[in-house]
Amino acid sequence: MCMVIFAPLFAMFAFATCGGYSGGLRLSVDCVNKTESNLSIDIAFAYPFRLQQVTFEVPTCEGKEQQKLALVGDSSSSAEFFVTVAVFAFLYSLAATVVYIFFQNKYRENNRGPLIDFIVTVVFSFLWLVGSSAWAKGLSDVKVATDPKEVLLLMSACKQPSNKCMAVHSPVMSSLNTSVVFGFLNFILWAGNIWFVFKETGWHSSGQRYLSDPMEKHSSSYNQGRYNQESYGSSGGYSQQANLGPTSDEFGQQPSGPTSFNNQI
């Protein structure tokens, strides 16, 4: 039930917070010659974070010439992989929810549904772990590449002490941090569901039968042995009691009375 409710929501939050991100930073370069200054240099970037394609122009403080620069790094592979896993997990969760609710008999027919569900759950657990870890590393690279201090180091005008370079505002990464959190939450959710899906497969029930059969055989043989011992003891006891009574052959017949007394009279 938890998978039916939380799996689609967690997957949706994961790809929405990452795939829908767009942010930016603003820098200012104050040259000695004020006419050459630019106090509002906006640098925008977004998913899939191909930062090397993000270009911007800054003053050189050496006349009207502008310097064209680009950000450093490319985290598109990890970001796209993460979003792809989230989208497919979302779609599968919705499809599985429909099957659970409306096609329960078809799901359990020939045990095919639980087996497929178990395999897919294991695969998605692994993909969530790999995708979340890769995206966490990719996000760390994005933060470094878009750090205003790092970007200012790329400008030739900022290497001259007479010019003043500063960051007006930094990019907001809260939604990207949330995407990483939801990625690992999805891994915990899917990995924790492996055991519950496994119990619905035939492998779990067959394993229990395999373990219970030897125990039943051992218990039946033990009870049979006890029954034989009790039967043997009881039969022996009765035979001994039967042999304790005297027989007519051993003691003979008792005399009926003295016959010689009648003869004397």
Curated annotation (Swiss-Prot):
One of its GO terms (cellular component) is synaptic vesicle membrane. InterPro entries: Marvel, Synaptophysin/porin. The keyword Transmembrane helix applies. Residues 210-242 are annotated as: 5 X approximate repeats. Residues 1-4, 103-114, 199-265 are cytoplasmic. Residues 221-265 are annotated as: Disordered. This is Synaptoporin. It comes from Mus musculus (Mouse). The gene is Synpr.
